[in-house]
From Swiss-Prot:
Reactions listed under catalytic activity: RNA(n) + a ribonucleoside 5'-triphosphate = RNA(n+1) + diphosphate
Lineage: Bacteria, Pseudomonadati, Pseudomonadota, Betaproteobacteria, Burkholderiales
Organism: Polynucleobacter asymbioticus (strain DSM 18221 / CIP 109841 / QLW-P1DMWA-1) (Polynucleobacter necessarius subsp. asymbioticus)
A Pfam family it matches: RNA_pol_Rpb6
GO biological process, one term: DNA-templated transcription
Name of the protein in question: DNA-directed RNA polymerase subunit omega
Family statement: Belongs to the RNA polymerase subunit omega family.
GO molecular function, one term: DNA binding
Subunit structure: The RNAP catalytic core consists of 2 alpha, 1 beta, 1 beta' and 1 omega subunit. When a sigma factor is associated with the core the holoenzyme is formed, which can initiate transcription.
Role: Promotes RNA polymerase assembly. Latches the N- and C-terminal regions of the beta' subunit thereby facilitating its interaction with the beta and alpha subunits.
This protein's UniProt keywords: DNA-directed RNA polymerase, Nucleotidyltransferase, Transcription, Transferase
Length: 67
């Protein structure tokens, strides 16, 4: 399995602080039971970073109000 790096994620979200916020928010969603958007058997934090690197999760999710 390929390793995920910060550089891979920074291509999608160039600001490191926004990257941390987006990945943390998405990891919490995954722990609460949301389905992952990429195929992975890793922990929620790694899955969240893989989603960011793949471009399916971005910083726009930080401005959305949860229902």
């Amino acid at each position: 399995m390929a390793r995920i790096t910060v550089e891979d994620c920074l291509k999608t979200i160039p600001n490191r602080f926004e990257l941390v916020l987006a990945a943390t928010y998405r990891a919490r969603q995954l722990v609460q039971g949301h389905s992952p958007r990429v195929e992975s058997r890793d922990k929620a934090t790694v899955v969240a970073l893989r989603e960011v690197a793949a471009g399916v999760t971005d910083r726009d999710m930080l401005t959305k109000v949860p229902l």
